[in-house]
């Protein structure tokens, strides 16, 4: 039973040393109700069942007297609450002995055990000489170690008594305490013991000195008693010390080596409260409590939020920290991505920062912070629109698109790709919407525009990194905190192929960084440009093809096979921004893999990107770029023949050229292309645009024929194959004739050889021979390309030889005198001409006597 009068306790609390320090030792457990009985009995408690039999608010008023008598004769504070409070006081005494270097230290101590939601804890308030701000925080380890030492000593004294057998609950509690004590002995006690702290102006936390008397009065005393989770506070708190307005609870309290009486606790609080916390204004308000009767009720959440807001204080930054925060803010607003940008645009702040200790290292850290902040906020396409805004306005209602000299359209048309389709795919890839196909490869020989296009895209984005495959240990050293990755002249080796597959597929992976820990690399779009076979992995002197299939599933390949002229020019970031922004605007409803397949009528996007399919009347020739670009196929719209002028005459209002009577007279064979229908073009004529006979080509003006021949000679086999379906008379061959008609034409040519040379023969249409790989794809590897060129050269030689033999036959048939030279008969001077007799079979109806009339003589 607790002892001591009220006056003694008032004097003990008032005599508390100043300054004082408040410590908390925590014994955490996730399930308190499962272990509290074993912990109670392990510490010597013997009345667990009696605690649950104490009467409470059950209406049995006649039992109140028996409850008070029971509390007088037995204190329910025995067991773990009692053991923890006394262990706290003994630990405080041992700590002050070491600080004052005496066996009987002079100090004041209040030790109080309490039960919380996640376990038990002990408040220890210590005041006295030897404990200062410098060593108060360090003393936590001494106090915690001593506390568990005395707690375990108390338990061992009870368990080592004769005839003591531990129950299962007690064994569980003992194992739990042993684990906590072992952590303390190892020094791992950061979440076990703590001291009340405050934050200084520079942001550091230091031990906070308190007034022990006021702290005990305001915080430690106004609490009801609770020793177990399953027992109400009303059961274990005496009537004179119980207050229903107190929401806090305690278990047991010790002050200066004596037990604080639970019967005089409320009286002690009243006396100390009137001395240290009472205010004249409070007395005035307490005299008229009805003033607060009509106030609205405020929820506990609102009160907690207000308290948290009141406790929050603005963090005071140092001068260096303010400069760093200003640099990050300005660099983020101005999109400054490199150290050079910071020096040029924030020279004053960088000068101040470099003048401080460690300024260069701080600048690198600031750049990393800026990159992390931008990458977390934008993707590559969104950031490109901010870094390199579009400078060209687009009119979707126009019949055609005005590219205004954008070299991207010239390059992609030359290489056989639709600029709108390629731009649609790149916008999706930069927006991270292409799934596993997270990378695009520009493949082909040198000087075909691969690097030109990849470099312009990366510079338009701005925040890009490069892959250095020469450094085989850290190839992706520059990849973290970037929006797009550029791999120039990509080569795959066994050293980094596995990491490369993760990066190319957009998988989150950690990559090694030189002189630093590994960094996480989230999904980042990758652009590759190479003239090597990136699907063949090289390891030492061996090559492996097992990685080809996984790599092709991650890479979308575009083949650039036509070399560019030296005067092609450089693609600028502004061209890329205009092109991609217009592509995104046109296809804004199809920016997904499903939308891409529906828009371009493809089953799926494989490793080989689809080639361009031109609309009728549209060309890949940059000469026609001034007429605009088709909204659908991306080709250049050709001019109409009516707009062409002859060098010898001026155009008339009807579209015929003055001075060319043949063209103006025959209007049935006129072919014209209109620029309406959103730039798709249409063929309009009064008669079929394809002539019915080969000789009808003579009606087309000679200037048009020359231009057609030049265009046919310039076009490659692949270009003509892709244009074979177009219904234009200057590209297609004449319609095949019937055998009878063809024989009559040949007979007419034999009879009148001079007529065959009066007009220019129709140009032959280049054809793609059977077996050539131009079936919608292009040569992939360098070996395929060499085989293709050798087959082309062999077939060209065969056609030339065949064409030479045909010409010789024509010459021989047109000049009969060549027969004599072929037979070796040469006319010599002074000799008579040699007469050759040629005999022919006579019809059966002729008479034999007239056979000599059928002989023909030819003089050589």
UniProtKB/Swiss-Prot annotation:
Residue positions binding ATP: 444-451
Region (Transactivation): 629-858
SS bond partners: none
Ranges of compositional bias, category Basic and acidic residues: 741-750
Domain SF3 helicase: 418-573
UniProt short sequence motif RCR-3, positions renumbered to this chain: 85-89
Keywords: ATP-binding, Covalent protein-DNA linkage, DNA replication, DNA-binding, Endonuclease, Helicase, Host nucleus, Hydrolase, Magnesium, Metal-binding, Multifunctional enzyme, Nuclease, Nucleotide-binding, Transcription, Transcription regulation, Viral DNA replication
Function: Multifunctional protein which displays endonuclease and helicase activities required for initiating and directing viral DNA replication. Also plays a role in viral packaging and transactivation of several promoters. Binds site-specifically to 2-3 approximate tandem copies within the origins of replication (Ori), unwinds this hairpin region and nicks one DNA strand thereby initiating the rolling circle replication (RCR). Becomes covalently attached to the 5' end of the nick and provides a 3'OH for priming DNA synthesis.
UniProt EC number: 3.1.21.-, 3.6.4.12
GO cellular component, one term: host cell nucleus
Protein name stated in the entry: Initiator protein NS1
Cofactor(s) required, per the database record: Mg(2+)
Boundaries of every PV NS1-Nuc domain copy: 1-145
Location of the region described as Disordered in the Swiss-Prot/TrEMBL record: 641-696, 728-860
Catalysis performed (reactions): ATP + H2O = ADP + phosphate + H(+)
Bias (Polar residues): 663-688
MF annotations from Gene Ontology: ATP binding; ATP hydrolysis activity; DNA binding; endonuclease activity; helicase activity; metal ion binding
Localization (cell): Host nucleus
Originating species: Bovine parvovirus 1
Cofactor binding note: The endonuclease active site can probably bind other divalent cations.
């Amino acid at each position: 039973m607790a002892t001591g009068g009220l006056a003694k306790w008032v004097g003990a609390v008032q005599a508390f040393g100043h300054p004082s320090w408040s410590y908390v030792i925590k014994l955490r457990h996730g399930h308190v109700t499962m272990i509290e009985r074993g912990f109670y009995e392990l510490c010597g408690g013997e009345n667990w069942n009696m605690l649950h039999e104490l009467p409470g608010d059950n209406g049995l008023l006649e039992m109140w007297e028996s409850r008070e008598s029971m509390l007088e004769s037995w204190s329910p504070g025995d067991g773990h609450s009692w053991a923890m409070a006394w262990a706290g006081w003994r630990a405080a005494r041992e700590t002050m002995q070491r600080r004052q270097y005496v066996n009987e230290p002079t100090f004041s101590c209040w030790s109080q055990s309490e039960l919380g939601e996640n376990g038990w804890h002990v408040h220890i308030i210590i005041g006295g000489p030897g404990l200062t701000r410098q060593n108060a925080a360090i003393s936590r380890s001494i106090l915690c170690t001593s506390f568990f030492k005395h707690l375990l000593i108390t338990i061992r004294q009870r368990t080592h008594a004769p005839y003591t057998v531990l129950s299962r609950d007690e064994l569980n509690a003992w194992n739990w305490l042993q684990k906590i004590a072992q952590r303390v002995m190892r020094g791992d006690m950061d979440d076990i013991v703590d001291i009340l702290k405050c934050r200084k102006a520079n942001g550091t936390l230091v031990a906070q000195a308190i007034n022990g008397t006021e702290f005990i009065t305001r915080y430690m005393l106004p609490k009801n008693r609770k020793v177990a989770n399953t027992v109400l506070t009303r059961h274990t708190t005496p009537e004179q010390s119980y207050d229903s307005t107190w929401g806090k609870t305690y278990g047991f309290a010790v002050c200066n080596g004596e037990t604080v009486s639970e019967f005089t606790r409320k009286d002690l609080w009243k006396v100390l409260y009137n001395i240290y916390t009472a205010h004249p204004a409070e007395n005035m308000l307490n005299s008229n409590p009805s003033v607060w009767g009509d106030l609205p009720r405020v929820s506990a959440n609102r009160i907690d939020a207000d308290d948290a807001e009141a406790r929050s204080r603005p963090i005071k930054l140092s001068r260096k920290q303010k400069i760093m925060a200003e640099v990050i803010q300005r660099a983020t607003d101005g999109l400054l991505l490199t150290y050079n940008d910071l020096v040029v645009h924030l020279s004053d702040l960088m000068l101040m920062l470099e003048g401080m200790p460690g300024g260069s290292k701080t600048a690198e850290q600031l750049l990393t912070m800026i990159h992390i902040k931008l990458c977390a906020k934008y993707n590559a396409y969104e950031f490109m629109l901010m870094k390199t805004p579009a400078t060209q306005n687009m009119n979707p209602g126009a019949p055609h698109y005005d590219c205004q000299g954008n070299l991207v359209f010239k390059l992609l048309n030359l290489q056989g790709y639709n600029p709108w389709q390629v731009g649609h795919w790149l916008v999706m890839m930069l927006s991270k919407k292409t799934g596993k196909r997270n990378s695009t490869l520009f493949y082909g020989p040198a000087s075909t525009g691969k690097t030109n296009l990849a470099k312009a895209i990366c510079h338009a984005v701005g925040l890009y990194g490069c892959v250095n495959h020469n450094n085989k240990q850290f190839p992706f050293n520059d990849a973290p905190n970037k929006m797009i990755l550029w791999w120039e002249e990509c080569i795959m080796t066994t050293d980094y192929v596995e990491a490369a597959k993760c990066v190319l597929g957009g998988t989150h992976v950690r990559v090694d960084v030189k002189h630093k820990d590994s960094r996480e690399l989230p999904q980042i779009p990758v652009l590759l440009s190479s003239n090597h076979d990136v699907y063949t992995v090289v390891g030492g002197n061996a090559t492996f093809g097992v990685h080809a299939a996984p790599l092709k599933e991650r890479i979308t390949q575009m083949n650039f096979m036509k070399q560019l002229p030296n005067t092609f020019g450089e693609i600028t970031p502004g061209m890329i921004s205009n092109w991609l922004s217009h592509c995104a605007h046109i296809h804004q409803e199809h920016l997904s893999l499903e939308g891409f397949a529906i828009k371009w009528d493809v089953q799926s996007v494989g490793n080989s990107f689809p080639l361009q399919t031109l609309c009728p009347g549209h060309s890949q020739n940059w000469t026609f770029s001034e007429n605009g670009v088709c909204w659908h196929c991306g080709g250049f719209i050709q001019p109409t023949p009516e707009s062409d002028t002859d060098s010898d005459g001026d155009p008339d209002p009807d579209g015929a050229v003055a001075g060319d009577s043949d063209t103006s007279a025959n209007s049935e064979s006129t072919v014209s292309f209109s620029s309406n229908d959103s730039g798709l073009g249409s063929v309009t004529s009064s008669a079929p645009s394809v002539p019915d006979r080969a000789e009808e080509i003579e009606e087309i003006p000679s200037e048009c024929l020359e231009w057609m021949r030049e265009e046919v000679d310039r076009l490659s086999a692949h270009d003509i194959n892709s244009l074979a379906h177009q219904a234009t008379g200057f590209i297609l061959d004449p319609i095949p004739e019937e055998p009878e008609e063809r024989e009559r034409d040949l007979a007419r040519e034999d009879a009148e050889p001079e007529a065959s040379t009066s007009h220019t023969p129709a140009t032959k249409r280049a054809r793609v021979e059977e077996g050539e790989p131009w079936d919608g794809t292009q040569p992939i590897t360098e070996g395929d390309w060499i085989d293709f060129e050798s087959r082309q050269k062999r077939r060209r030689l065969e056609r030339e030889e065949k064409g030479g033999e045909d010409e010789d036959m024509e010459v021989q048939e047109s000049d009969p005198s060549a027969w004599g030279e072929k037979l070796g008969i040469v006319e010599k001077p002074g000799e008579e001409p040699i007469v050759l007799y040629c005999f022919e079979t006579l019809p059966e109806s002729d008479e034999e006597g007239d056979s000599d009339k059928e002989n023909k003589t030819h003089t050589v």
